[in-house]
């Protein structure tokens, strides 16, 4: 038993530290999504691994209770935007790390055009310039739900928002 105040690790480290192919892939993901370190890649990998493990378990079982669990797992993945509407449990087995990394607040800020680069998006989130439905969120790894996606914007009192509005007015 662990200590109740100490949360368990949210990621698993790779089984072998010096695998060139894995390191190359992790470096590509770190560069593409502007991650701080490989731990963020490992967190996403662990999330995908747990979703796929649960899906394999549920596909192998057939009972009334597992039917509810299937709905819950699919509902969670659809709400978070990792899977599309109408997805089946078999689709969970096809999930990749990039499916999870695309749902991060940092990535969506860049995709919506609020930042020029993913690194700038990360900095804007950390410095408190980004709000989600009016609430300041300073965690770039926050998984944005499907309903919150269009509510991403600048924090109302952000000096960054004022600078961008001034630049747009000057044009």
UniProtKB/Swiss-Prot annotation:
The keyword RNA-binding is annotated on this UniProt entry: yes
Record bears the keyword Ligase: no
Chain ranges of the S4 RNA-binding domain: 103-167
UniProt keywords, alphabetically: Ribonucleoprotein, Ribosomal protein, RNA-binding, rRNA-binding
Pfam name, any one: Ribosomal_S4
GO molecular function: rRNA binding; structural constituent of ribosome
Family membership: Belongs to the universal ribosomal protein uS4 family.
Assembly and interaction partners: Part of the 30S ribosomal subunit. Contacts protein S5. The interaction surface between S4 and S5 is involved in control of translational fidelity.
Job of this protein: One of the primary rRNA binding proteins, it binds directly to 16S rRNA where it nucleates assembly of the body of the 30S subunit.
NCBIfam families, A to Z: PRK04051.1, uS4_arch
Protein name as catalogued: Small ribosomal subunit protein uS4
High-level lineage: Archaea, Methanobacteriati, Methanobacteriota, Methanomada group, Methanobacteria
Gene: rps4
